[in-house]
Amino acid sequence: MKVVFVIPIFNDWDSLKILSEQIKKTSIKEKWNDVGLVIVNDCSTHDLDTSSKPFALKSTILNLISNQGNQRAISIGLSYINDQITDYDFIIILDADGEDKP
């Protein structure tokens, strides 16, 4: 089963790394064989540390050039999936803050 997560983010990169690990654990438990992240960076003012592998799963980061807000960032992520990723079974939308469990 292929599951794609849309995750809008604004500056909270540390929480996103934790969420990525939680998604990885959940994917093993649920036996999802293909999991991807579409991370929509809503013009964060803090840079992502790219010196190490930031996420436990394959991911695409969409960098917006201006802050669009949470809902618009989600919409952009969904549009990206519709245009670029055609072979998925489910799309799950999660905020990066870790309040929701994967």
Q: How would you label these PLM feature ranges?
A:
Residues 12-28:
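Short, well-formed alpha-helical segments that are part of the catalytic scaffolds
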Residues 27-32, 54-58, 85:
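Short helix-capping segments at alpha-helix termini
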Residues 2-7, 16, 23, 35-40:
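Hydrophobic targeting segments
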Residues 41-50, 98-99:
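A conserved acidic beta->alpha catalytic loop
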Residues 12-16, 44, 101:
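Donor nucleotide-sugar binding loop of glycosyltransferases
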Residues 32-43, 63:
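Short beta-strand/loop segment that forms part of the nucleotide-sugar
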Residues 52-80:
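Conserved donor nucleotide-binding strand/loop of the catalytic core
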Residues 85-99:
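Short beta-strand-to-loop acidic/aromatic patch adjacent to the donor-nucleotide binding site
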